[in-house]
């Protein structure tokens, strides 16, 4: 079972808030799925506890599924600090606020507002490209340098076409990331 039930000791009323600190350790497995490492990337997604959604049907207590889109979560704001070895480039949810480095490590400070999840992927092999289109910073993280420029053009064209058809992209950044991921793709 992957559901943690916590007894609060008192009823939490509508719009009332509380804080809960959970300390835990995460060991990243050798896996080319959503969470794990492969030959080229370290995929750190779905890696922290989230609250079950309480909607008009009550608490949604569905467990994690390995196939399909098994996630149902509220949106949140994230303020994350990550300390990683300098050899890696990082693709992440949200906007980079600050970065500091020494000879061995890099400290990233990242914010993401009104998103359903916070994910990041590390690789020492990324070829990173950045362009801007319609006020959106477009980032591509490629494992094949020969295809890197084309991947960036396709990402830019996607933002332009979808913005015309469906309305302005609601975030300031859009990233496309190549990874060791057996399913073929995932949106975060």
Summary of predicted features, one role per range:
Residues 1, 44-45, 83, 87:
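Solvent-exposed beta-hairpin/edge-strand motifs
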Residues 1-40:
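A surface-exposed beta-strand-loop module
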Residues 3-8, 62-67, 92-97:
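Short structured motifs
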Residues 24-78, 129:
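Glycine/proline-rich low-complexity spacer/linker segments in large multi-domain proteins
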Residues 54-55, 69-188:
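Hydrophobic helix-coil surface modules that form long, contiguous segments used
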């Amino acid at each position: 079972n992957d559901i943690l039930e916590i007894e609060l000791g008192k009823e939490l009323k509508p719009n009332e808030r509380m804080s809960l600190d959970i300390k835990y350790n995460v060991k990243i497995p050798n896996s080319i799925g959503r969470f794990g490492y492969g030959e080229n990337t370290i995929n750190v997604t779905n890696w922290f506890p989230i609250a079950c959604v309480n909607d008009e049907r009550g608490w949604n207590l569905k467990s994690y599924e390995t196939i399909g889109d098994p996630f149902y979560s509220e949106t949140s704001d994230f303020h994350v600090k990550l300390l990683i070895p300098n050899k890696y480039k990082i693709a992440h949810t949200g906007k980079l606020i600050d970065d500091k480095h020494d000879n061995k490590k890099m400290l990233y400070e990242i914010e993401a507002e009104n998103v359903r999840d916070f994910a990041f992927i590390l690789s020492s092999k990324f070829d990173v490209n950045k362009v801007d289109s319609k006020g959106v910073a477009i980032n591509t993280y490629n494992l094949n340098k020969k295809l890197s420029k084309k991947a960036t053009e396709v990402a830019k064209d996607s933002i332009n076409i979808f913005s015309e058809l469906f309305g302005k992209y609601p975030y300031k950044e859009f990233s496309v990331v190549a990874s060791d991921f057996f399913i073929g793709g995932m949106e975060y």
